Amino acid sequence: GTAHRAQGSVVGPAAYLPAVAGFLLEKEVDTLTGIFAEPERPFVAIVGGSKVSSKIGVLDHLIDSADTLIIGGGMAYTFFLAQGLSVGQSLKEEDWVERAGEMLKKAEEKGVKILLPIDNRVADHFGEDAVPEVVASDAIPDDREGMDIGPKTEELYAEAVKGAKTVFWNGPMGVFEFDNFA
């Protein structure tokens, strides 16, 4: 669907006409409501993207409903900071580190398994021509930034999904805009 896009053809008419959800949006909402209300178990949720702050509500809800929560993308580095790891020049939200730590604790208390990357593709700069290097999550150099999950993490995440009866996925695991990290 396109409801999330801020393009003139999507948002323009709604400013001048009565607006309602279309059939596709209604179907998506019904599907998600069903998934979260009574998921077939095991329920594995995968959340990626760049910022914890933009997904905080989703993450909180998933800790209450998922059996396993897989975290990737730029938001993983904020969780690494909450665990006391160094993240080099990686994207991070310093203001959300404490909240990320609280979410890790909440998941542990509820018996929800949290999977974070165990290795990462890093680079010396953010750009299309950046050359990936693979490093362990606890060994990100100070002059490198995380751009994607690494090959061991890909295997770990694939294994976690294999036995799932329900999988919910929202957001990318890396900088998909650059071919070397897509």
Language-model features, listed with the residues they occupy:
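Active-site loop-to-helix "anion-binding N-cap" substructures in soluble metabolic enzymes
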Residues: 1-182
